[in-house]
């Protein structure tokens, strides 16, 4: 059976993506082996999932070593410079942009490592990865 890996920011720990996810899960569960990976820092699950849906709760704070490695990685990454200084950069001071891009990159790297370590990249030819938002979860899949 094909797998669907759904990456959420809040659901089912808080309301978050509930209006988008709930109507779709009933149908997708009939055709896919569904897993939800929630990145919410909340501890208590507020909303039930349909039977058969596996839930994984991801929340990780970076260690000092990971932050330092990310800083050096940024210095060697052309996309980092384009995001901070390029024509399409976000508004605000360059320091604020730099911190946002650096943290986004670190979060994506740590989440990608989690996905790899937990086996979510096994059987990729039979897996669909889905994120509602363009955030570090989506970037981890890039």
Question: Model regions: which residues?
Answer:
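N-terminal subdomain of nucleotide-sugar transferases
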Residues: 1-64, 124
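Extended hydrophobic/aromatic segments used for targeting, binding, or gating
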Residues: 6, 136-142
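Serine-centered coil/turn micro-motif
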Residues: 15, 77-78, 135
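Short, flexible coil/linker elements and helix-boundary hinge sites characteristic
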Residues: 33, 85-86, 117-119
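A conserved catalytic-core segment of Leloir-type glycosyltransferases
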Residues: 43-106
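Short N-terminal targeting/anchoring amphipathic segment
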Residues: 95-106, 113-136
């Amino acid at each position: 059976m094909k797998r669907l890996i759904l990456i959420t920011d809040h659901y089912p720990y808080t309301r978050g993506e509930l209006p988008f996810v709930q109507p779709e899960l009933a149908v997708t569960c009939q055709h896919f082996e569904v897993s939800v990976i929630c990145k919410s820092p909340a501890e208590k699950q507020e909303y039930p999932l349909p039977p058969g849906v596996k839930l994984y709760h991801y929340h990780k704070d970076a260690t000092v070593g990971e932050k330092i490695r990310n800083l050096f990685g940024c210095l060697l990454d052309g996309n980092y410079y384009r995001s901070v200084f390029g024509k399409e950069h976000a508004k605000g001071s360059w320091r604020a942009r730099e911190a946002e891009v650096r943290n986004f990159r670190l979060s994506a790297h740590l989440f990608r490592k989690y996905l790899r370590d937990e086996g979510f990249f096994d059987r990729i030819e039979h897996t669909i990865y889905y994120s509602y938002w363009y955030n570090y979860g989506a970037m981890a899949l890039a």
